[in-house]
Amino acid sequence: MTLIAGLGNPGPKYENTRHNIGFMLIDLLKDSNFKDVSSAKFQGEVFKFNGIILLKPTTFMNLSGQSVKAVRDFYKPDRIIVIHDDLDLSFGAVKFKKGGSSGGHNGIKSIDNLIGNDYERVRVGIGHEGDAKNFVLGEFSDEEKKALDEILAYTKNAVCELLKSDINEISQKFTVKKGLIK
């Protein structure tokens, strides 16, 4: 069983912000086959199908670990994949990583504090301009919006391939270092 957690902040205020790219990808991965198995104990929206659990924590980003831990403790997945935004990567860049530091990402820090860092990460670049907090909580620019569908589709495909493969192989095949904006 594999748990895929997409990080973001709950509520309409944050729906289209850069910090919610993990939520956007979970929404793309979830099709009509997935059954909603959400429960208050999970502190998140949880969907399950064919050995795959999709999670969107309903905690705020800084507390994402509580939701990931609750789902992990209940379902005991063999594999955990976390999808999140990354300020240190250019907009549209996609990188894959297992373990390592949080890179200052508060959602990743929260997960690391509660379950350790022995899980796979799909890092989606959002770039960085000015104050980090305002930037991640801001909506995508018009130029970014034009490329967002392509970036999300590419990353969704990479995650689907990751489910069937090893992170090192997928990293070699799908890593995008410079972003997808042309």
Swiss-Prot record:
Q: Which family does it belong to?
A: Belongs to the PTH family.
Q: Where is this site: Stabilizes the basic form of H active site to accept a proton?
A: 85
**What name does UniProt use for this protein?**
Peptidyl-tRNA hydrolase
**Which species?**
Campylobacter concisus (strain 13826)
Gene Ontology MF terms in the entry = peptidyl-tRNA hydrolase activity; tRNA binding
Task: Name the PROSITE patterns on file.
Answer: PEPT_TRNA_HYDROL_1, PEPT_TRNA_HYDROL_2
Under the heading Pfam families, the entry gives: Pept_tRNA_hydro
Q: Key word tRNA-binding present in the record?
A: yes
Q: Which residues form a coiled coil?
A: none
Q: Where is this site: Discriminates between blocked and unblocked aminoacyl-tRNA?
A: 9
Which residue positions are annotated as catalytic? 19 (proton acceptor)
